[in-house]
């Protein structure tokens, strides 16, 4: 990963999938993602990133009620609670960890098969850090992001990161144009400085 004002790249061993969806469809899409990346033979480790602490609690409770072995890490937890959750995730006792960006940097968790961005991050740098939790130590990983109309300001920069990592971006470009048309915004008003979509 390289981060700088004009030089931002993602690990090319991470398959990046971006779904442009309606905000209301996120809970259903999350369940489909978890089903997709869960392997019956192994306990695939997955991190689900959210923006807010309240979202972390809500998503953790929902997944627990659906039968997932899940823990969460966020700013309202004491350090000992975060450490306990992290150890449970590393040991495989819990195979899903719901986290705010407190877990996006500095944590070395081996064998995370998938990162799911339930809430898209506020900056493209945070996106690159989040997805960097998978595809570590020469292994491949998957980053699946749910991108909504509210995230449109990062669309151009996201497309650039995807292209630079050799990912398929045709669908997201079309969807970004669609979102911009729906919201009657013009490219000149949007911070799409990273890529000209016209």
Language model regions located:
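Conserved helicase RecA-like core
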Residues: 1-198
């Amino acid at each position: 990963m390289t981060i700088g004002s004009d030089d931002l790249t993602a690990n090319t061993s991470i398959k990046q999938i971006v779904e442009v969806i309606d905000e209301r469809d996120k809970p259903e899409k999350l369940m489909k993602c978890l089903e997709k990346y869960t392997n019956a033979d192994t306990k695939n480790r997955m991190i689900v990133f959210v923006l807010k602490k309240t979202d972390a609690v809500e998503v953790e409770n929902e997944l627990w009620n659906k039968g997932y072995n899940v823990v969460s890490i966020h700013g309202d937890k004491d350090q000992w609670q975060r450490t306990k959750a992290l150890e449970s995730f590393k040991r495989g006792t819990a195979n899903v960890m719901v986290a705010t960006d407190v877990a996006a940097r500095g944590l070395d968790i081996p064998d995370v098969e998938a990162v799911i961005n339930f809430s898209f991050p506020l900056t493209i740098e945070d996106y690159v850090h989040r997805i960097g939790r998978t595809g570590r130590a020469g292994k491949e990983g998957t980053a699946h992001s749910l991108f909504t109309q509210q995230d449109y300001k990062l669309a151009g920069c996201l497309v650039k990161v995807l292209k630079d990592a050799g990912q398929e971006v045709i669908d997201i470009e079309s969807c970004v144009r669609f979102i911009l048309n729906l919201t009657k915004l013009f490219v000149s008003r949007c911070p799409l400085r990273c890529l000209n979509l016209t």
